[in-house]
Swiss-Prot record:
InterPro entries reported for this sequence: DnaJ_domain (IPR001623), J_dom_sf (IPR036869), Jiv (IPR032843), Viral_replicn-host_int_reg (IPR052317)
Protein name: DnaJ homolog subfamily C member 14
Topology of this chain in the membrane: Multi-pass membrane protein
Molecular-function annotations in GO: dopamine receptor binding
Residue span(s) of domain J: 444-508
Compositional bias per record (Pro residues), positions renumbered to this chain: 75-84
One Pfam entry name: DnaJ
Biological-process GO terms, alphabetical: protein transport
UniProt biased composition (Basic and acidic residues): 1-11, 203-218
Polar residues composition bias: residue spans: 121-133, 673-684
Length: 703
C-alpha cells in the first residue's frame, strides 16, 4: 500500500463498498500527460515503486474534523479526517489493508483504460488554497450516485459561511443548463469525460446541534458544482461566440486574398495584351485588315446565298399553296354546280311526276286537313292536358339546368319563380299591373301567382313568397309596386282560404263546362257551315256535291298540253285535266275567284269534255238568261239571295251574287206582264218543283 503524504491527497475513486486512493505504476503514466494536466510537479514515486499523483489541498476542498463524531459511537467510523494517529482506532489496520487492495485494482483499471483509449482516465484537481492541511487526510467519501468522484475539503478554508452560500444558490436548482453547438468539455480521445458535477462532490452531513452550537455543514448537494458548471458554460458560450467571429474573420480574409489574386491575374493579362500589341508591326495590321475583309466578304456572300435560298423557298411554297387552293376551289365550285343542277333536275322531275299523279290535289287536301278546326281542337285539348304541361315543365327545367343557361341567368340576375321561368322584378311588377283593372271576383289567382291550377299548397306558398320579395314596396322601388303587391295579396287571399278557394274552383269548373259546350257547338256549326259552303247543288240528283278548293291562282289555273304551260282562267270557266298517264280526269272550275275541284258534280252530270285543251270547252252560267238574248248571261249582283246558302255566304263575307249551286239556269227575271206571285225556281220547294221541271229549257253548255 502506498503511503500517504501529510500535505498531499490522492485522487480517489468512489465505490459503494469503500473508498480507495488512485495510484498508478511508474511505467503506466506518461510524463507528457502529467505535464499536460499540470501534475508533473505533484507526481511522486512511492517507496514501493508506485507513482502517485498528489493534490494540494485547499480551503475550498477540505472539511474540518468533527470531534463529536469521534466520541459518539452511534455514528460509526468517521467519514472525514480523523483524529491524530496517536489516538488510533482498533479498526484502522483493517481499513488500511482493504484500501490497499482496492488501490491496486483501481491502478490496474486505469492502466488498462489508458492503454485502450490513448488518454488518461483521470484528471488532477488542483487545490484552490495554499495551505498544507492536516496530516493524514482521509480519502473523500463516496457520492450517493456512485459515479466514482470524491473530494476533500481543507479545514482551514471551511467556514460557516458555506451555509449562507447554500441559500444564495437556491435559485440555480431549477435552471436548465445552457446548450451550445460545440462541447468544450470533451477530451481529445472523443470519450465523454466526467462532468464537473461528478468531479466536485461535497460531503453530506446531518445538521447536529450540540449544546446550542451549530456545527458547520457542507453546502447542499450539487449546488456549488452546478454554480461552477453554469459559470463554465457561460464562459464556453462566450468563447464559442468569439470562435465564430474568428472563423468569419478568417473566411473574409481568405476571400479578400482571392479577390486580390484575381485582380492581379486580370492586370497581368492586360499587360500581356499591351505588350503584344506594342510588338505588332504595320504589316501585321495590314494583314489583319485583309483577313477581316476576306472574312467579311465571305460572310456577306453566305448571307446573300441564305437570303436567296430562303426567298426562293418561300415563293415556291406560296405558289404551291396558291395552286392547291385554286384546284380545291375549282373542285368545290364544280361540286356546287353539280349539286344545284341535280336539285333543279330533281325538282322538275318531281313537279312533272306530281302533275301526272295528281299530287296537288292530295297536297291541297293535306293542307285543308291541317287547317281543319277538328285538328285545332285536338291540339288545344292536348296543350291543356296535364301530361303535356308536365312535359313542357320538364323540358324547361332541363333547359334551365344547362351550364351556359345557368351562367347567363346568374349574370342577368334573374329570380326564379315556382313555375320554372326566370323573370326580373320589373317584369313581374309590369305583369301584375296588367291585371289591375280585373275585378276581384274575376281574378285568376293561379295566373297571378304564375303557377298551374293543379299546383299544391307548397308550390303556391313558394311562388307567393318569391313574388312578394320581388314586388314588395320595401324591396322594389317601382312607383306602382304597392299596387302590384295588392293584386298579389288578393290572389293569395283567395288560394290561402280553403272556403274561398273551393268556391273559386266550383265557379271555374262551371265556366269551363259552359265554355266547353259553347265551343263544341260553335265548332260543329262552323264545320257544318263550311261544308255547306263547299257543296254544289245538283239539278240531276237534287242533291249536293262537295267541291275542293285548289291552291292555284286565276292567272295560272288551266294546264295546256299543246303549250305545255298554264293559262289564265276567267270566272265561270269549266275545264278538265288528265293525270296518271291519261287514266284519271279531273274537272275544275273558277268560281268566286278561286279554283275548285268539282269532279263529283261533273261525274253526276255525266259531262264529257276533252282534257288539257288550249281553249276553254265550257262555261258555267250562274245567272238567268233573258228571253230574246243570246250569249253568256250572268245574274246581277243586286238579285236577292234565293236560298239559305246565299244567306250563309253573306254571313261568312262571301261577295253577294250568283252562288255555285250547280244550276245552269238561274231564275228568270219577272217580265212586265208577270204578276208578283211568280217566284224564282230556286225558291220553290222540292215537292212542288218536280212537275214544273219539264217547262224549263235546258242549255247546260254554251260555247
Amino acid at each position: 500500500m502506498a503511503q500517504k503524504h501529510p500535505g498531499e491527497r490522492r485522487l480517489c475513486g468512489a465505490h459503494r463498498s469503500g473508498g480507495t486512493s488512485l495510484s498508478t505504476s511508474g511505467s503506466s503514466v506518461d510524463p507528457e500527460i502529467l505535464s499536460f494536466s499540470g501534475l508533473r510537479d505533484s507526481a511522486e514515486t512511492a517507496p514501493n515503486g508506485t507513482r502517485c499523483l498528489k493534490e494540494h489541498s485547499g480551503p475550498k476542498y477540505t472539511q474540518p474534523p468533527n470531534p463529536a463524531h469521534w466520541s459518539d459511537p452511534s455514528h460509526g467510523p468517521p467519514r472525514g479526517p480523523g483524529p491524530p494517529r496517536g489516538g488510533g482506532y482498533p479498526d484502522e489496520s483493517e481499513t488500511g489493508s482493504e484500501e490497499s487492495g482496492v488501490d491496486q485494482e483501481l491502478s490496474r483499471e486505469n492502466e488498462t483504460g489508458y492503454q485502450e483509449d490513448g488518454s488518461p482516465s483521470f484528471l488532477s484537481i488542483p487545490s484552490a488554497c495554499n495551505c498544507q492541511g492536516s496530516p493524514g487526510v482521509p480519502e473523500g467519501t463516496y457520492s450517493e450516485e456512485g459515479d466514482g468522484s470524491s473530494s476533500s475539503l481543507c479545514h482551514h478554508c471551511t467556514s460557516p459561511a458555506l451555509g449562507e452560500d447554500e441559500e444564495l444558490e437556491e435559485e440555480y436548482d431549477d435552471e436548465e443548463p445552457l446548450k451550445f453547438p460545440s462541447d468544450f468539455s470533451r477530451v481529445s480521445s472523443g470519450k465523454k469525460p466526467l462532468s464537473r458535477r461528478q468531479k466536485h462532490r461535497f460531503l453530506i452531513k446531518e445538521d447536529v446541534r450540540d449544546s446550542g452550537r451549530r456545527e458547520p455543514k457542507a453546502p447542499g448537494r450539487h449546488r456549488l458544482a452546478r454554480k461552477r458548471s453554469q459559470t463554465d458554460k457561460r464562459r464556453g458560450l462566450g468563447l464559442w461566440g468569439v470562435e465564430e467571429l474568428c472563423q468569419l474573420g478568417q473566411a473574409g480574409f481568405w476571400w479578400l486574398i482571392e479577390l486580390l489574386v484575381l485582380v492581379g491575374e486580370y492586370v497581368e493579362t492586360c499587360g500581356h495584351l499591351i505588350y503584344a500589341c506594342r510588338k505588332l508591326k504595320g504589316s501585321d495590321l495590314d494583314l489583319f485588315r485583309v483577313w477581316v475583309g476576306v472574312w467579311a466578304r465571305r460572310l456577306g456572300g453566305w448571307a446573300r446565298m441564305m437570303f436567296q435560298f430562303l426567298s426562293q423557298s418561300f415563293f415556291c411554297v406560296v405558289g404551291l399553296l396558291i395552286r392547291i387552293l385554286r384546284v380545291v376551289g375549282a373542285f368545290l365550285l364544280l361540286a356546287l354546280a353539280l349539286f344545284l343542277g341535280c336539285l333543279q333536275l330533281g325538282w322538275r322531275f318531281s313537279v312533272g311526276l306530281g302533275n301526272r299523279l295528281g299530287w296537288r290535289d292530295k297536297t291541297a287536301w293535306l293542307f285543308s286537313w291541317l287547317g281543319s278546326p277538328a285538328l285545332h281542337h285536338c291540339l288545344t285539348l292536348l296543350k291543356d292536358s296535364r301530361p303535356w304541361q308536365q312535359l313542357v315543365r320538364l323540358i324547361q327545367w332541363g333547359w334551365q339546368e344547362l351550364p351556359w343557361v345557368k351562367q347567363r341567368t346568374k349574370k342577368q340576375g334573374n329570380a326564379p319563380v315556382a313555375s320554372g321561368r326566370y323573370c326580373q322584378p320589373e317584369e313581374e311588377v309590369t305583369r301584375l299591373l296588367t291585371m289591375a283593372g280585373v275585378p276581384e271576383d274575376e281574378l285568376n289567382p293561379f295566373h297571378v301567382l304564375g303557377v298551374e291550377a293543379t299546383a299544391s299548397d307548397t308550390e303556391l306558398k313558394k311562388a307567393y313568397r318569391q313574388l312578394a320579395v320581388m314586388v314588395h314596396p320595401d324591396k322594389n322601388h317601382h312607383p306602382r309596386a304597392e299596387e302590384a303587391f295588392k293584386i298579389l295579396r288578393a290572389a293569395w287571399d283567395i288560394v290561402s282560404n280553403p272556403e274561398r278557394r273551393k268556391e273559386y274552383e266550383m265557379k271555374r269548373m262551371a265556366e269551363n263546362e259552359l265554355s266547353r259546350s259553347v265551343n263544341e257547338f260553335l265548332s260543329k256549326l262552323q264545320d257544318d257551315l263550311k261544308e255547306a259552303m263547299n257543296t254544289m247543288m245538283c239539278s240531276r240528283c237534287q242533291g249536293k256535291h262537295r267541291r275542293f278548293e285548289m291552291d292555284r291562282e286565276p292567272k295560272s289555273a288551266r294546264y295546256c298540253a299543246e303549250c305545255n304551260r298554264l293559262h289564265p282562267a276567267e270566272e265561270g270557266d269549266f275545264w278538265a285535266e288528265s293525270s296518271m298517264l291519261g287514266l284519271k280526269i279531273t274537272y275544275f272550275a273558277l268560281m268566286d275567284g278561286k279554283v275548285y275541284d268539282i269532279t263529283e258534280w261533273a261525274g253526276c252530270q255525266r259531262v264529257g269534255i276533252s282534257p288539257d285543251t288550249h281553249r276553254v270547252p265550257y262555261h258555267i252560267s250562274f245567272g238567268s238568261r233573258v228571253p230574246g238574248t243570246s250569249g253568256r248571261q250572268r245574274a246581277t249582283p243586286e238579285s236577292p239571295p234565293a236560298d239559305l246558302q246565299d244567306f250563309l255566304s253573306r254571313i261568312f263575307q262571301v261577295p253577294p251574287g250568283p252562288m255555285s249551286n250547280g244550276n245552269f239556269f238561274a231564275a228568270p227575271h219577272p217580265g212586265p206582264g208577270t204578276t208578283s206571285t211568280s217566284r224564282p225556281n230556286s225558291s220553290v220547294p222540292k215537292g212542288e218543283a218536280k212537275p214544273k221541271r219539264r217547262k224549263k229549257v235546258r242549255r247546260p253548255f254554251q260555247r
